[in-house]
């Protein structure tokens, strides 16, 4: 097994030492590495391994899980994550399973399910006049891709055209645009006023950021769709592409992006004894609904 723990977190580091010791006491081979391993070259770590681990245990928040999941995009390795030093922790199991060592018995007895989370793939194309179409870069994301201005000193209006399945759908004017998976609907998209989508629903959320038109609303589409994003700035300003909170590259006026679903989903282990998705929303978002749900969960 491989243990990836959140960098710059003493709590996560200590938890990784505890986890490593727990595994070795049961004669389970394991190794610890930081999430910022070798200057954020986590992908290269797996590429250079002689033998891949059977399981990756992630200790941190959702950001650490996203980084680990993106590094594993080409490998069929499940992820078991615990919320150690993170904030919301939508993608993680409760840390009690780790510290009371019950996670070992749960794994041995197979008292868990594999939760398949669909990912996003983005190809960035150069479409300069009189040049052959070519891919400049390719990226994968578990939560989302989004497009925002390159400018840091001012906040200009961006103009972004969107096509769905070869059909021009809209031109958004505003601060930017988010394309999220169902998993990512509780991340940046939710903060920008987008809908919460259950992770079992195979969908994309297209959500404009602070649009200048009241008619520009978030929409949910099947994740079998092909989404094309074009920069149509009249002022020659450039837009930056982001994935899962990390900068990718600058999208120039004649460039465009094709976004679709990744063939291989992310495998995440969910314990049978874990709280439900809806209880997670109540706890993480501090919903003030029927308090009996919280009371029943505590009994």
From Swiss-Prot:
Pfam families: NAD_kinase, NAD_kinase_C. It is found in: Cytoplasm. Signal peptide: none annotated. It is an enzyme of class 2 (transferase). Its main location: cytoplasm. One of its GO terms (biological process) is NAD metabolic process. Its EC number is 2.7.1.23. One of its GO terms (cellular component) is cytoplasm. It catalyses: NAD(+) + ATP = ADP + NADP(+) + H(+). InterPro entries: ATP-NAD_kinase_N (IPR017438), ATP-NAD_kinase_PpnK-typ_C (IPR017437), NAD/diacylglycerol_kinase_sf (IPR016064), NADK (IPR002504). Keywords: ATP-binding, Cytoplasm, Kinase, NAD, NADP, Nucleotide-binding, Transferase. GO terms for molecular function: ATP binding; metal ion binding; NAD binding; NAD+ kinase activity. Its cofactor is a divalent metal cation. The active site is at residue 62. NAD(+) binds at residues 62-63, 67, 143-144, 173, 175. Involved in the regulation of the intracellular balance of NAD and NADP, and is a key enzyme in the biosynthesis of NADP. Catalyzes specifically the phosphorylation on 2'-hydroxyl of the adenosine moiety of NAD to yield NADP. HAMAP family: NAD_kinase (MF_00361). Belongs to the NAD kinase family. PANTHER family: NAD KINASE (PTHR20275:SF0). This is NAD kinase 1. The lineage of its organism: Bacteria, Bacillati, Cyanobacteriota, Cyanophyceae, Synechococcales.
């Amino acid at each position: 097994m491989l243990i990836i723990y959140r960098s710059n977190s003493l709590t996560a580091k200590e938890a990784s030492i505890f986890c490593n010791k727990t595994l070795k006491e049961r004669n389970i081979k394991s190794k610890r590495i930081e999430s910022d391993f070798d200057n954020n070259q986590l992908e290269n770590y797996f590429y250079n391994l002689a033998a891949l681990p059977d399981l990756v245990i992630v200790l941190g928040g959702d950001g650490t899980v996203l980084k680990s999941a993106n590094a594993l995009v080409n490998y069929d390795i499940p992820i078991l994550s615990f919320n150690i030093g993170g904030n919301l922790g939508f993608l993680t199991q409760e840390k009690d399973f780790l510290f009371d060592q019950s996670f070992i018995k749960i794994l041995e007895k197979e008292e868990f399910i594999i939760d398949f989370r669909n990912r996003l793939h983005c190809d960035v194309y150069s479409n300069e006049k009189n040049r052959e179409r070519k891919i400049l870069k390719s990226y994968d994301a578990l939560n989302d891709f989004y497009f925002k201005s390159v400018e840091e000193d001012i906040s200009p209006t961006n103009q972004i055209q969107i096509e769905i399945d070869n059909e021009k759908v809209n031109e958004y004017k505003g601060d930017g645009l988010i394309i999220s998976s169902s998993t990512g609907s509780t991340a940046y998209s939710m903060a920008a006023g987008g809908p919460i989508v259950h992770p079992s629903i195979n969908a994309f959320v297209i959500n404009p950021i602070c649009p200048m038109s009241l008619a520009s609303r978030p929409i949910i589409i099947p994740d079998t769709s092909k989404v094309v994003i074009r920069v149509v700035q009249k002022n020659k300003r450039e837009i930056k592409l982001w994935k899962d909170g990390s900068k990718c590259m600058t999208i120039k006026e004649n460039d465009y992006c094709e976004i679709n679903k990744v063939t291989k989903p992310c495998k995440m282990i969910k314990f049978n004894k874990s709280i439900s998705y809806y209880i997670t929303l109540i706890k993480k978002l501090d919903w003030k609904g029927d308090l009996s749900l919280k009371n029943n969960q505590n009994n």
